[in-house]
Amino acid sequence: MPNLTLPKEQPTLRVIPMVYDTNARGDIFGGWLMSQIDIAGATVATIRAKGPVATINVNKLTFEAPLYVGDVVSFYARVTRIGTKSLNVEIDVFAERNRQLDGEVVKISNAELVYVAISEPGKSRVIPQ
C-alpha cells in the first residue's frame, strides 16, 4: 500500500473515536462514521448556503478501511455543485493510526451528500449566489 499523507488544506472536522463508538467486533461502528461525515458535510454546506441546511440524500458512501479507538480521524469536505436550492458536498476521510509509531495515514472513506438550504421554519429556500 502506498504511503499516504494528509491533504494540505485544513480539515473541516477532526475527532478521535472512543471505546463507546465501537461495534461488537471492537472497531468503530459504521453509523458513527456516517454521522461524523454528515456533520463535516453540513458544516461547509451551511457556510456556502449562508444559513441552515438539511441532508436530503447520500449519493455515495464507501468504507475503504476500518477505524479503531484512538485513531485521529480527519474529514475534508468541499462543495462540488451548487444548484438553486441544493448543493452537493464531497467528503474524504483519513485516519492517522495513533497507536503506531510510524504515523501511518489510511484512507477510510469517501462520500457525497446532498443538502438543501432551508429557512428557519424548515422550508426550502434559494441559495444566495
Locations of regions flagged by a protein language model:
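Hot-dog-fold acyl-thioester-processing enzymes
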Residues: 2-57, 116-129
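HotDog/MaoC-like acyl-thioester-processing domains
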Residues: 3, 7-13, 68-69, 80-129
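Extracellular/lumenal ectodomain signal focusing on beta-strand-rich modules
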Residues: 58-60, 110
